[in-house]
Curated annotation (Swiss-Prot):
Its EC number is 3.5.4.19. Zn(2+) binds at residues 85, 101, 108. Binds 1 Mg(2+) ion per subunit. It comes from the Bacteria. It catalyses: 1-(5-phospho-beta-D-ribosyl)-5'-AMP + H2O = 1-(5-phospho-beta-D-ribosyl)-5-[(5-phospho-beta-D-ribosylamino)methylideneamino]imidazole-4-carboxamide. InterPro entries: PRA-CH, PRib_AMP_CycHydrolase_dom, PRib_AMP_CycHydrolase_sf. This is Phosphoribosyl-AMP cyclohydrolase. Catalyzes the hydrolysis of the adenine ring of phosphoribosyl-AMP. Homodimer. PANTHER family: HISTIDINE BIOSYNTHESIS BIFUNCTIONAL PROTEIN, HISTIDINE BIOSYNTHESIS BIFUNCTIONAL PROTEIN HIS7. Pathway: Amino-acid biosynthesis; L-histidine biosynthesis; L-histidine from 5-phospho-alpha-D-ribose 1-diphosphate: step 3/9. Mg(2+) binds at residues 84, 86, 88. Signal peptide: none annotated.
Amino acid sequence: MGENEGIDKSFLDTVKFDDRGLIPAIVQDHETGKVLMMAWMNRESLEMTLERKKACYWSRSRNKLWLKGESSGNMQEVFDILIDCDGDTLILKVSQIGGACHVGYHSCFYRKVNEDGSMQICDTLMFNPEEVYGKKH
């Protein structure tokens, strides 16, 4: 994603959005390949991501655009976008500032399932969500 490259409309036209106009985006650390999160994108959020080089998603719960880190400061600088062979899933390779997960961990995939079915924390807590977002009511 060079500085002088404009949005390639042919890429946007190959993206296969679902019947809700969404496509899943798997987000990875661009240096380590660690999976940080999965989020949904619509055409507008994908265009915004391409233009700004900052990850923008579509919040299904809030029904609006969601610039990652807008309220927490935990932004994602986008280095690469990959599209799968079917055109219906994306990978965003990012540099994550702070934690990707809204509960404070570096990755949303911070719990490992053990053989006995129990779970254990397997990631680093990056921030206290109550300090960032306030207490839930």
